[in-house]
Amino acid sequence: MGFRLSHLSLALSFVALALAGVAIYRNTYEAIIMNNGSLLQNASPHFDSLESGVASILTLNNKKRNSDMYLRQQLTPEACVFSAVRGVVDSAIDAETRMGASLIRLHFHDCFVDGCDGGILLDDINGTFTGEQNSPPNANSARGYEVIAQAKQSVIDTCPNISVSCADILAIAARDSVAKLGGQTYNVALGRSDARTANFTGALTQLPAPFDNLTVQIQKFNDKNFTLREMVALAGAHTVGFARCSTVCTSGNVNPAAQLQCNCSATLTDSDLQQLDTTPTMFDKVYYDNLNNNQGIMFSDQVLTGDATTAGFVTDYSNDVSVFLGDFAAAMIKMGDLPPSAGAQLEIRDVCSRVNPTSVASM
């Protein structure tokens, strides 16, 4: 009798477990139908039963939970690259909002010196190679190199068999920074190459400086085939970010009318920063509003209002942010197309901070 009761108890336990399993299945089944009803309705001709449809939906949902690496590998080559770079840039800006402005500036400083060739990314090598990073316009100022290195590695890891230059990655990072900070996105075409050289002197002579008067600025932008309107639009990059006090808040570099805005220590150390407009983390038109009120921080910015033509563009952008954002995006596309110097040795770098050991990818 006891033996039979034991078997009966065991049987009842199995029944209870089975019923619990049915309940769990039903709850899961109903939840899946609720969340994927349209999928199941549309898919019914392809399944032997609704249960097999649920099983297929479960498989799809499991795939959704796979890593970003897996998802990116399902994209087209260009889409994979854009996704990989954007993930790194977004994380960097989330960690430090200022990084967005730094990446935009890094792209500008790359393209304005012998074209968009990734030259600014090359590290100095003691005694054998002098790059652009320690040229006065960039020394202790240009930043974001590590973000570009991380983005390059992300592309390598998640987009196998796709060769993308460091110059391309820098262009994408700048575009994504503009969008992340509230600006207008724009198309970035791929296909740039990386230079095997850099130009220390070119960084000093070709880049606009905070003490440049309007005539000098016009000449530097004209040398790159930019119009006056495009010059004023690109200056709008100063609507985000900060600059070193030692650079912008010294005599000759600062707009005298705005000098009281400089929030710097008496020693003007490199760690002292001055915001370039009153909303330094937002890609907006406040930079132009400040110029119209004679409150631009840098001398080179405020002189844009000293000429009737350039002052008119400042007013246009101050009056309508959408006009500024559209013109800025168009000017960035044009800048991103500046070609490397004629005769430059080019490649696709494996590591952005150094040239390849042998120029297997020379172009």
UniProtKB/Swiss-Prot annotation:
- Signal sequence: where? 1-20
**Binding residues for Ca(2+) 1, per the UniProt record?**
110, 113, 115, 117
* Keyword Oxidoreductase in annotation: yes
Residues at the catalytic site: 109 (proton acceptor)
How the cofactor is bound: the record states: Binds 2 calcium ions per subunit.
Please give the catalytic activity noted in the UniProt record: 2 a phenolic donor + H2O2 = 2 a phenolic radical donor + 2 H2O
What does the record give as EC number? 1.11.1.7
Q: Which CDD domains does the UniProt entry name for this protein? A: secretory_peroxidase (cd00693)
The record ties this protein, via Pfam families, to: peroxidase
SUPFAM superfamilies (UniProt xref): Heme-dependent peroxidases (SSF48113)
Q: Which residues bind heme b?
A: 238
Q: What drives induction of this protein's expression?
A: During wound-healing and by factors which induce suberization.
Q: Which UniProt keywords apply?
A: Calcium, Disulfide bond, Glycoprotein, Heme, Hydrogen peroxide, Iron, Metal-binding, Oxidoreductase, Peroxidase, Secreted, Signal
* Annotated positions for site Transition state stabilizer: 105
**Could you name the domain of life of the organism this protein comes from?**
Eukaryota
For the ligand (substrate), the binding residues are: 208
The cofactors named for this UniProt entry are: Ca(2+); heme b
Localized where? Secreted
Q: Which residues of this UniProt protein bind Ca(2+) 2?
A: 239, 277, 279, 284
Q: Name one GO biological process term.
A: response to oxidative stress
Which residues are connected by disulfide bridges in this protein?
Answer: 80-159, 111-116, 166-352, 245-264
* Family, per entry: Belongs to the peroxidase family. Classical plant (class III) peroxidase subfamily.
Q: What does this protein do?
A: Removal of H(2)O(2), oxidation of toxic reductants, biosynthesis and degradation of lignin, suberization, auxin catabolism, response to environmental stresses such as wounding, pathogen attack and oxidative stress. These functions might be dependent on each isozyme/isoform in each plant tissue.
Name the record gives this protein: Suberization-associated anionic peroxidase
